[in-house]
Structures are given as structure tokens and as C-alpha cells.
From Swiss-Prot:
Compartments reported by the entry: Cytoplasm
Protein name from the UniProt record: Phosphoribosylformylglycinamidine cyclo-ligase
Catalyzed chemical reaction(s): 2-formamido-N(1)-(5-O-phospho-beta-D-ribosyl)acetamidine + ATP = 5-amino-1-(5-phospho-beta-D-ribosyl)imidazole + ADP + phosphate + H(+)
Sequence similarity: Belongs to the AIR synthase family.
UniProt superkingdom: Bacteria
Length: 356
């Protein structure tokens, strides 16, 4: 084959294969550290493998979820803090799996950028690996797409894909959810990964930079505080499901807040009544509400307001479920109950405490 000395190369077009290979070398140890029963977490092949029998399943139903982290990546890019956004990526998908009673088994990521920086990408994958280990799932593959002309240099986007399993007959929500069941809330770690277009607009209007001390948490920067990773609820919720047998349903509070997410796990004839005075509203939400002049109902439909997961449990087992979740490291509060729906599916009593 003739080698044209002056011919164009892929690198001339902006795609650096050598940088991609360097990235693979950097992340292999991180990926290997996520190995679990059923997967060796080795990368480099054309596909990742998972052995359900080795993982201990006998009659499993597979559950899949995928998600991203929205414009939270813009804050990571602008601050240069890339080592936590991968935790968000994992959490957004695996929290959706546990809502259905499934144990996360494996995860795959998609990373797209304009110009590949192996150090930045490896920092992101390091966060993904942390999230996978905490969720108990193996990182078995992914895609790195360098696309000059589509993304600006320095910009990137992420998507994650998770697959879990539950034994047949154990999936949530249960068919026995009924009026009178108790509703408890599991505390969030912060804004998590939803509503960041509004967050960024509020920060811009405030005139503050991401490097200044956070008005609601002066011990850290505003950017660092807003990049607090999404909480992973997998191990605590699976423990509560398995040890108590009293968890009838779970709702991951993401985009749409309480208003749109809770009805997704309820039969159509049922709703939920929440006492807002029982919510411990995190300082970040108080600041956003005040700085942005956000109405209470808008706040409840946009952000988690301090509760990242809702559990619907048997009324007679509330104390047992709360004890298990607390022992697993969760901060839990009773919020209300399931009701017969006669209009709005989510009914709010009292008001959020938004005083700074």
C-alpha cells in the first residue's frame, strides 16, 4: 500500500487515537476495582460479559435504566472539578433500578467530547468507578467519542446505562399499595443532578462566581457545593426491602420533584399526602428559592428539596423500616401517607421552612 507523505490523517481531523489508548491504560485499574460476582470488569473487548448464575440469581427479571447528569456538567467544566460528576452519572441510573427492587449488576458509560484530554476523562471515570463500587455493580464497558466540530474543546457530555436484576415476583412497586400506607423520606445530599439549568441561571443572575465561598455553605466554594454528588440509595434500600419485607414502593425524586415522580409508582386511584413542615430543607434550596424568587410549588416540582428518595411502607412496620435505613446510614423522616386520589395525586399540607 502506498503511504502518501502529505496525505491527511485522522489526527489532522481532530481525533487522536493515541490519546484514546492512553485513556484506556489510565482507567483499566479503576475499572478492574469494580469487579463483582458475575463480572471480572475487564475492558478492551468488543462487549462486556455478565454471568447471572454466578451472581446467585435463579429466576431473574432484568431491569435497565439510563440517564445523564444534565447541565451539571457545565459546572464541572467551568470549575475544573471532574472527579465527582461520574458518581452522579452512576447514581442517576442505579437509583432508578433499586426503585423497582432490582440489584444493580453492571454499568456502561458514554463520554463525548470535542478534544479528548485523557487526564480529564480518567478523572471522570474514577468517579464512575467510585459510584459503581458503592452501588455494587461492575463497570463492564463504555464508549469514548471524540467529535471535533460537534463539541467545543473542553466541553463534554455524559450518559450512563445500568442493568440490574430481581428474582421474579419481587419487583416493586408492589400491587398491594393501599390508602393508609406510610410515606417516609430519605435525605438527599444536595441538588443531586436535576434542575441545573435553573441553578446556573440563578447563579448567573446573582453575579457570583463558582470560586467564591458558597453563601449557604461558606466552608466550600459555590462550585464545589453545587457539585456535591448525588446520593446513592442502593445498598440501604435493598437492605430495607430484604430485611423487612415491608417496603411496597420507592420513588426516586429527580426531574419533576415530588409532584411528578411519586405518582409514577402509585395505582391510578391513589395519591399521597405530604406534610411539608416535616421536610428538612437543605440550605442550598433555601438559598436558591430566595435568590431566584422561586415559588414553593415550582420548587417542589423542580428540586428534591432535601429528600432524594421516597419509600412507601406498611403502616405497622414504619419503625422497623426506619431503623434498618438509619443503621444503613440514611437520615429518614416520616412525611405523610397514601390517600385515595380525588384530584391532585400529590397533596401538600403546610409549607416548606425556607428561612435561612
Amino acid at each position: 500500500m502506498t503511504d502518501r507523505k502529505n496525505g491527511l490523517t485522522y489526527a489532522d481531523a481532530g481525533v487522536d487515537i493515541d490519546a484514546g489508548n492512553r485513556l484506556v491504560d489510565l482507567i483499566k485499574p479503576m475499572v478492574r476495582a469494580t469487579a463483582r460476582a458475575g463480572a471480572d470488569a475487564e475492558i478492551g473487548g468488543f462487549g462486556g460479559l455478565f454471568d447471572l448464575k454466578a451472581a446467585g440469581f435463579t429466576d431473574p427479571v432484568l431491569v435497565a435504566a439510563n440517564d445523564g447528569v444534565g447541565t451539571k456538567v457545565k459546572i464541572a467544566i467551568e470549575t475544573g472539578i471532574h472527579d465527582t460528576i461520574g458518581i452522579d452519572l452512576v447514581a442517576m441510573s442505579v437509583n432508578d433500578l433499586v426503585v423497582q427492587g432490582a440489584e444493580p449488576l453492571f454499568f456502561l458509560d458514554y463520554f463525548a467530547c470535542g478534544k479528548l484530554d485523557p487526564e480529564v476523562a480518567s478523572a471522570i471515570v474514577a468517579g464512575i468507578a467510585v459510584g459503581c463500587r458503592e452501588a455494587g455493580c461492575a463497570l463492564i464497558g463504555g464508549e469514548t467519542a471524540e467529535m471535533p466540530g460537534l463539541y467545543k474543546d473542553g466541553d463534554y457530555d455524559l450518559a450512563g446505562f445500568a442493568v440490574g436484576a430481581a428474582e421474579r415476583g419481587t419487583l416493586l412497586p408492589g400491587r398491594d399499595i393501599a390508602a393508609g400506607d406510610a410515606v417516609i423520606g430519605l435525605a438527599s445530599s444536595g441538588v443531586h443532578s436535576n434542575g441545573y439549568s435553573l441553578v446556573r441561571k440563578i447563579v448567573e443572575a446573582s453575579g457570583l462566581g463558582f470560586s467564591v465561598p458558597a453563601p449557604f455553605a461558606p466552608v466550600t466554594t459555590l462550585g464545589g457545593a453545587l457539585l456535591t454528588p448525588t446520593r446513592l440509595y442502593v445498598k440501604s434500600c435493598l437492605r430495607a426491602i430484604r430485611e423487612t419485607g415491608a417496603v411496597k414502593g420507592l420513588a426516586h425524586i429527580t426531574g419533576g420533584g415530588f409532584t411528578d415522580n411519586i405518582p409514577r409508582v402509585l395505582p391510578k386511584h391513589l395519591g399521597i399526602r405530604i406534610d411539608l413542615s416535616r421536610l428538612t430543607v437543605l440550605p442550598v434550596f433555601k438559598w436558591l428559592a430566595r435568590q431566584g424568587g422561586i415559588a414553593e410549588l415550582e420548587l417542589l416540582r423542580t428540586f428534591n428539596c432535601g429528600v432524594g428518595m421516597i419509600a412507601i411502607v406498611r403502616r405497622d412496620a414504619v419503625e422497623q423500616v426506619v431503623d434498618v435505613l438509619t443503621q444503613a446510614g440514611e437520615r429518614v423522616a416520616p412525611l405523610g401517607s397514601v390517600i385515595e386520589a380525588s384530584g391532585d395525586r400529590v397533596v401538600y399540607d403546610n409549607h416548606l421552612d425556607l428561612a435561612m
